[in-house]
């Protein structure tokens, strides 16, 4: 089997050594080279043509954003950003520019703790050969040519349904490639749907609040990071908090969020399966589950639960998925109602809701 060739770009000598040590412990990986600033980094990427680049965003001579634009424009290569939690807004900018994923340093200023992210970075590196680089390049070009407009100011969401709808909730799960995909779906609507949307995106603690705030600015929905006790109501989008699972329960005639610590068997967090299964239990046949891009099989048990409760399930098509792992496993269950390219998912949701909501 061909080994995964990686170039490590980081201005911290300790961080470079730590990342190289992690990578060299993987028999399927070879570190082809490293660089301590952006200018040297782009030369190494062009000369060595690696399968993957790990990238620090804050560097001398050429910052990570400039380097990322050059890589995606001249020698498209999968890039994993390694970032401090304090740089959360920068991470989402990097994902928009074409980075495929990110790994969070455990805490700012404690380089030694970088060693604790070994499992996370190794898992993401192993998925490099399953990445859909054509779709990553296409999305990056679309964002550069036509960045999403700022959504019109929204009125405060009210806990009531103002238009009849065949669904109560749309539950979306995703992993690698998910943040730009979710942004694309939500920003496609010109008006909020008369249903709730709940989202579990595999993401560490410390990043989901910024993700929710970003989506809130770029869509007509009220989007927030879910907190325990939040009410689920039409027009509201709730994002599972990083490092925790989001489930639901009925309380005094409403449905509320319960934020739970992950169980030992939860490999992926926040768990898409846990969210989908809870939606099936609470919302029953008025649930639509959507499994987007991502590695692994999270979501496959959840779509079975939704179908068992009489609900509906969609999966993202291979043509648009950055990683087809999660959608493939959902489709393999045999219960998915339709396989849909990313750019048509918002329209499909609207049709299944049964409301004539305008789309861009």
Swiss-Prot record:
Involved in chemotaxis. Part of a chemotaxis signal transduction system that modulates chemotaxis in response to various stimuli. Catalyzes the demethylation of specific methylglutamate residues introduced into the chemoreceptors (methyl-accepting chemotaxis proteins or MCP) by CheR. Also mediates the irreversible deamidation of specific glutamine residues to glutamic acid. The gene is cheB2. The active site is at residues 175, 202, 298. Residues 5-120 form the Response regulatory domain. Gene3D superfamilies: 3.40.50.2300, Methylesterase CheB, C-terminal domain (3.40.50.180). It catalyses: [protein]-L-glutamate 5-O-methyl ester + H2O = L-glutamyl-[protein] + methanol + H(+); L-glutaminyl-[protein] + H2O = L-glutamyl-[protein] + NH4(+). Its main location: cytoplasm. One of its GO terms (cellular component) is cytoplasm. GO terms for molecular function: phosphorelay response regulator activity; protein-glutamate methylesterase activity; protein-glutamine glutaminase activity. Contains a C-terminal catalytic domain, and an N-terminal region which modulates catalytic activity. One of its GO terms (biological process) is chemotaxis. Phosphorylated by CheA. Phosphorylation of the N-terminal regulatory domain activates the methylesterase activity. It is found in: Cytoplasm. The keyword Cytoplasm applies. InterPro entries: CheB-like, CheB_C, CheY-like_superfamily, Sig_transdc_resp-reg_Me-estase, Sig_transdc_resp-reg_receiver. It comes from the Bacteria. Keywords: Chemotaxis, Cytoplasm, Hydrolase, Phosphoprotein. The modification 4-aspartylphosphate is found at residue 56. Residues 169-356 form the CheB-type methylesterase domain. This is Protein-glutamate methylesterase/protein-glutamine glutaminase 2. SMART domains: REC.
């Amino acid at each position: 089997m061909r080994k995964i060739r990686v170039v490590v770009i980081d201005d911290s000598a300790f961080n470079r050594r730590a990342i190289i040590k992690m990578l060299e412990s993987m028999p399927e990986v070879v570190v082809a080279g490293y660089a301590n600033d952006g200018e040297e980094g782009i030369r190494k990427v062009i000369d060595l043509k690696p399968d993957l680049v790990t990238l620090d965003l804050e560097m001398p001579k050429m910052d990570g954003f400039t380097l990322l634009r050059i890589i995606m424009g001249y020698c498209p290569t999968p890039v994993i950003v390694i970032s401090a939690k304090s740089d959360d807004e920068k991470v989402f900018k990097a994902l928009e520019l074409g980075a495929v994923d990110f790994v969070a340093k455990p805490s700012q200023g404690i380089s030694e703790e970088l060693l604790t992210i070994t499992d996370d970075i190794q898992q993401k590196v192993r998925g490099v050969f399953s990445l859909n680089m054509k779709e990553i390049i296409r999305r990056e070009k679309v964002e550069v040519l036509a960045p999403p407009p700022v959504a019109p100011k929204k009125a405060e969401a009210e806990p009531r349904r103002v238009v009849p709808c065949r669904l109560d909730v749309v539950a979306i799960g995703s992993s690698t490639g998910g943040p730009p995909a979710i942004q694309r779906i939500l920003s496609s609507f010109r008006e909020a749907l008369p249903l709730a949307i709940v989202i579990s995106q595999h993401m560490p603690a410390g990043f989901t609040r910024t993700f929710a705030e970003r989506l809130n600015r770029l869509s007509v929905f009220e989007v927030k990071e879910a907190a325990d006790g939040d009410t689920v109501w039409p027009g509201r989008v709730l994002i599972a908090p990083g490092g925790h699972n989001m489930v639901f329960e009925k309380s005094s005639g409403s449905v509320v969020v319960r934020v739970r610590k992950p169980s030992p068997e939860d490999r992926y967090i926040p768990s898409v399966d846990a969210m989908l299964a809870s939606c099936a239990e609470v919302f029953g046949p008025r649930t639509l589950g959507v499994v987007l891009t991502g590695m692994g099989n999270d979501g496959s048990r959840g779509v079975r639960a939704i179908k068992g409760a009489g609900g509906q399930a969609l999966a993202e098509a291979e043509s648009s998925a950055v990683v087809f792992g999660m959608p493939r496993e959902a489709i393999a269950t045999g219960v998915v109602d339709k396989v849909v390219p990313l750019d048509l998912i918002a329209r499909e949701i609207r049709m299944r809701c049964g409301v004539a909501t305008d789309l861009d």
